């Protein structure tokens, strides 16, 4: 049984505040929804920051996207509600959807580098395999059409090329967790690449992890082939990224090549020190 409608509206606003505070949406970006009955969905309005939402901002639509009840503030439903409705229709078990632009995950979507597998246990258990849908224009039918082929019975998150992400689950809180875990994982991946090598779980480690996941009541189709090494088969684009070494912090400041020598660094420090001393004496 669903909680009272007013409580669901309040939770929608609270989740919006969390999304905004985490920096997952700027301006009036993003949208989220909750399925409140077989043919009704509660969704965020268009044209408002998720950080400014309150319960009276929420809109109610039918499964065709028509706004079926007047909003007390005159708000109109999000223009991207078609994505939400398509997911609800394909997956009746899904009760909440969040579309957002988490920066680290969106960077992967823009670079169109598949999220690597077999690296971080929490990502494997709570996200599983995350695929990237081809680019489609926001607010058009092409957007849900691009996502639906990637949604299987175990899918809970999809990246949208050059756009953002969409997460979905059995309730709004768990859907938010999926979003938060996604961006945290992508941030860790980017930090790891800056350090250098990436350690991947081997076949045995990955199989054992997926068996634990199954014990948690979270089935994963990859368990059937993990012993053969199917996990991580698309990791190469990520592992091969960052082919150019970062530039060093010191240079001659005249367009010359960067230098890492101790002498050059000490000379630069001395020059700056001399300038500071001279300025203090004036």
Predicted regions, residues:
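Glycine-rich flexible loops
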Residues: 1-282
